Amino acid sequence: MRLVIVAVGQRVPDWAQTAWDDYAKRFPFELKVELKAVKTEPRGSKTVEALVAAERGRIEAALPKGCRIVALDERGTPLTTLALAAKLQNWQLESDDVALVIGGPDGLDPAFKQAAHERIRLSDLTLPHAMVRVLLIEQLYRAWSINANHPYHRE
């Protein structure tokens, strides 16, 4: 099974890339984590609808065939770390690849969010996109560690 993080935006600060790389290498062989960064649509005179529609096309092209799509959305279902661990365990039992999708500056296309298998919220706070990548991979690693009885997570 693979966890594929599809994120709109290609450039992140060095600290975010370093943190991503650190967590990505911690995952076990049987749970691969992959980042697919897609280009942000250039801002200008385009409407928000046109921008997110263009980004949607890039996101869909980056998705693995037949994957479970989980959209990160500020109005998605809030999760605790333990609830995320339970979701991860279920995803692993289903054995399908899971794509967790992080939108661009204007979020995700509404139709894409509606079509996703799930919508989750990482926080009630508005976070920078680089921080979302790091927070997401850390929480996925923490969820794995809970399920594997690894000492990383402590109650």
UniProtKB/Swiss-Prot annotation:
Residues that coordinate or bind S-adenosyl-L-methionine: L72, G103, L122, S123, D124, L125, T126, L127
Keyword rRNA processing recorded: yes
Record's subcellular location: Cytoplasm
Keyword Methyltransferase carried by entry: yes
Cross-referenced PANTHER family: METHYLTRANSFERASE (PTHR33603), RIBOSOMAL RNA LARGE SUBUNIT METHYLTRANSFERASE H (PTHR33603:SF1)
Catalyses which reaction(s): pseudouridine(1915) in 23S rRNA + S-adenosyl-L-methionine = N(3)-methylpseudouridine(1915) in 23S rRNA + S-adenosyl-L-homocysteine + H(+)
This enzyme's EC code(s): 2.1.1.177
Enzyme kind, highest EC tier: transferase
HAMAP family to which the protein is assigned, alphabetical: 23SrRNA_methyltr_H
Domain of life: Bacteria
Alphabetical UniProt keywords: Cytoplasm, Methyltransferase, rRNA processing, S-adenosyl-L-methionine, Transferase
Name this polypeptide is given: Ribosomal RNA large subunit methyltransferase H
Subunit-structure text: Homodimer.
Cited Pfam families: SPOUT_MTase
Function text: Specifically methylates the pseudouridine at position 1915 (m3Psi1915) in 23S rRNA.
Similarity annotation: Belongs to the RNA methyltransferase RlmH family.
Record-level Gene Ontology MF annotations: rRNA (pseudouridine-N3-)-methyltransferase activity
